[in-house]
Amino acid sequence: PMTLGYWNIRGLTHPIRLILEYTNSGYEEKRYNMGDAPDYDRSQWLNEKFKLGLDFPNLPYLIDGTHKLTQSNAILRYIARKHNLCGVTEEETIRMDILENQVMDIRMQLIMLCYSPDFEQKKAEFLEGIPDKMKLFSQFLGKLPWFAGNKLTYVDFLAYDVLDQYRMLEPKCLEAFPNLKDFISRFEGLEKISSYMKSSRFLPKPLFSKFAFWNNK
């Protein structure tokens, strides 16, 4: 089986865990634990970091036989290619490329907020900007069932994850966008996803590491 290595948090790895489950991939997880404040000891990971044969040692990593990958989107795309969860047409590919990067942008904006010591002060302004972000996602999805088109692709796993994170921060943020709410329901209704969400393997939170200022436990 494949081995997925990451901190014992949701973090950047939720879409990867979801796609591994959806595709029925045989995998095991190596979840590294971080120590508590003030040191946040990382030795569980650091002791192995340079022993795994990774080109750019980092978390998450995926080891699949001779293939050893880092970078969360590279891992996600690798699994997607094995299972035809990539677009076929140029139009689908363009939409996937745009959305993959757009998701990373709004993910990083949320990460910057949540790891900021000024989280409480910055939160109000951040919340004000959420409707505009969601509106663009809603317009991009339009009447399509999935973000690239009529079939599920790896970017739906990314979009689901980031929309869900924003929903955790601001529970009403999707209320004005019925197509995004329907997308979430459609995704969570996929048989493999639904059963994974009910299993003990499912790790919906903490979103972030112990030194974040929100959703850190």
Swiss-Prot record:
Start and end of every GST C-terminal domain?
89-207
Keyword presence, NAD: no
- Which EC number(s) does the record attach to this protein? 2.5.1.18
Q: Which UniProt keywords apply?
A: Cytoplasm, Lipid metabolism, Transferase
Q: What is its main location?
A: cytoplasm
* Residue ranges of domain GST N-terminal in the record: 1-87
User: Gene Ontology terms, cellular component aspect?
Assistant: cytoplasm
Q: Which residues bind glutathione?
A: 6-7, 45-49, 58-59, 71-72
**A Gene Ontology molecular-function term?**
glutathione transferase activity
Q: Where does substrate bind?
A: 115
**Which reactions fall under this protein's catalytic activity?**
RX + glutathione = an S-substituted glutathione + a halide anion + H(+); prostaglandin A2 + glutathione = prostaglandin A2-S-(R)-glutathione; prostaglandin J2 + glutathione = prostaglandin J2-S-(R)-glutathione; prostaglandin J2 + glutathione = prostaglandin J2-S-(S)-glutathione
Keyword Cytoplasm among UniProt keywords: yes
Which InterPro entries does its entry note? Glutathione-S-Trfase_C-like, Glutathione-S-Trfase_C_sf, Glutathione_S-Trfase_N, GST_C, GST_mu, GST_superfamily, Thioredoxin-like_sf
Q: Which GO terms describe its biological process?
A: glutathione derivative biosynthetic process; glutathione metabolic process; hepoxilin biosynthetic process; prostaglandin metabolic process
Looking up Pfam families in the UniProt record yields: GST_C (PF00043), GST_N (PF02798)
Q: List where in the cell it is found.
A: Cytoplasm
Q: How does it assemble?
A: Homodimer.
Physiological role: Conjugation of reduced glutathione to a wide number of exogenous and endogenous hydrophobic electrophiles. Involved in the formation of glutathione conjugates of both prostaglandin A2 (PGA2) and prostaglandin J2 (PGJ2). Participates in the formation of novel hepoxilin regioisomers.
UniProt lists the family membership as follows:
Belongs to the GST superfamily. Mu family.
In Swiss-Prot or TrEMBL terms, this protein is called: Glutathione S-transferase B
Q: Which gene encodes it?
A: GSTM1
